[in-house]
Curated annotation (Swiss-Prot):
GO terms for biological process: lipid transport; positive regulation of triglyceride storage; triglyceride homeostasis. May participate in lipoprotein metabolism. Belongs to the apolipoprotein C4 family. It comes from Plecturocebus moloch. It holds the Pfam family APOC4. The lineage of its organism: Eukaryota, Metazoa, Chordata, Craniata, Vertebrata. InterPro entries: APOC4. The gene is APOC4. Residues 1-27 form the signal peptide. Keywords: Lipid transport, Secreted, Signal, Transport. It comes from the Eukaryota. This is Apolipoprotein C-IV. It is found in: Secreted. GO terms for cellular component: high-density lipoprotein particle; very-low-density lipoprotein particle.
Length: 125
């Protein structure tokens, strides 16, 4: 049951990461459309052959996916998603972080005092 709860907590972060990566991929593919092809000597290396083969295999899938999900790239949809994500997960991040830092500091000080010899760390009245 605990594993299921952890997976459900990680789902919004995973969705955000996938969305951001998809946006980056869409922007990069548009930026590289006008670039010239590499010189012939670069095309002969094995790594470039692997890259070109992977591009041949993946480019149609990426294009189809981008076309199908075009409604998602609209600014209002993305802005709405980000606003909802912020409201649900990040709005109270500052106070939560401050509380966590204070609790961590107190815990660390308590552990330090418990390890310190009484002669060195004793409180003076």
């Amino acid at each position: 049951m605990s594993l299921l709860r952890q997976r459900l907590q990680a789902l919004p972060v995973l969705c955000l990461c996938v969305l951001v990566l998809a946006c980056i991929g869409a922007c990069q593919s548009e930026a590289y459309e006008g670039t010239p092809s590499p010189p012939p000597e670069q095309k002969m290396s094995r790594w470039n052959l692997v890259q070109s083969r992977m591009k041949e295999l993946l480019e149609p899938a990426v294009t189809r996916t981008r076309d199908r999900w075009q409604w998602l790239w609209s600014l209002s949809t993305f802005r709405g998603f980000m606003q909802t994500y912020y409201d649900d997960h990040l709005r109270d991040l500052g106070p939560r972080t401050k509380t966590w830092l204070l609790e961590s500091k107190d815990s660390l000080l308590n552990k330090t005092y418990s390890l310190c010899p009484r002669l060195l760390c004793a409180h003076k009245n």
